[in-house]
């Protein structure tokens, strides 16, 4: 079953020249977001640019959120990652979806109009309520932190 999410088209090229975000396969977790820029753009090494996607969403359900994640090929092959690492879209946000692109490579990266540059994934949300305690019940891990469980 698919959950309906409200989507507003902010750039008229979405739905005409470029498709609406959609799952590529039945097993896809994310939908591609596109660079809805006005002209070809070059992102210099070390530079971060905020890229419009041409859409806005309203998740509405407080039990859901959306996350904007990088596309693995862009990061691995070209050093293009998200400037904020993960974009979190709260259920009550209704503004435009923007992607912060950071070129962490040492070569300029050219972004063309409509290029797929990130993916949108919907995730369940649990709002926690803290319970103050003086001590925790013991666990196998205890206070073991970074590197505690090893690599093998």
Curated annotation (Swiss-Prot):
Disulphide bridges, residue numbers: none
Membrane-crossing residue ranges in chain numbering: none
Any one of the GO BP annotations: dUMP biosynthetic process
Entry binding sites for substrate: 71-73, 84, 88-90, 98
Cross-referenced CDD domains: trimeric_dUTPase
GO molecular function: dUTP diphosphatase activity; magnesium ion binding
Enzyme Commission code: 3.6.1.23
Record has Hydrolase as a keyword: yes
Entry cofactors: Mg(2+)
Keyword vocabulary terms for this entry: Hydrolase, Magnesium, Metal-binding, Nucleotide metabolism
Pathway: Pyrimidine metabolism; dUMP biosynthesis; dUMP from dCTP (dUTP route): step 2/2
PANTHER family according to UniProt: DEOXYURIDINE 5'-TRIPHOSPHATE NUCLEOTIDOHYDROLASE
Family: Belongs to the dUTPase family.
Protein name stated in the entry: Deoxyuridine 5'-triphosphate nucleotidohydrolase
């Amino acid at each position: 079953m698919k959950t309906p999410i409200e989507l507003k088209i902010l750039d008229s090229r979405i739905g005409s020249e470029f498709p609406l975000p959609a799952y590529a396969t039945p097993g896809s977790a994310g939908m591609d977001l596109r660079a809805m820029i006005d002209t070809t753009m070059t992102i210099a090494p070390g530079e971060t640019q905020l890229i419009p996607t041409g859409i806005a969403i309203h998740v509405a359900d407080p039990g859901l959120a959306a996350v904007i994640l990088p596309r693995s090929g862009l990061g691995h092959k070209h050093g293009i990652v998200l400037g904020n690492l993960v974009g979190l879209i709260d259920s009550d946000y209704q503004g435009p979806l923007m992607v912060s692109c950071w070129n962490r490579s040492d070569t300029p990266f050219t972004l063309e109009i409509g290029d797929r540059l990130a993916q949108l994934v919907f995730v369940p949300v649990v709002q926690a309520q803290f319970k103050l305690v003086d001590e925790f019940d013991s666990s196998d891990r205890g206070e073991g932190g970074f590197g505690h469980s090893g690599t093998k």
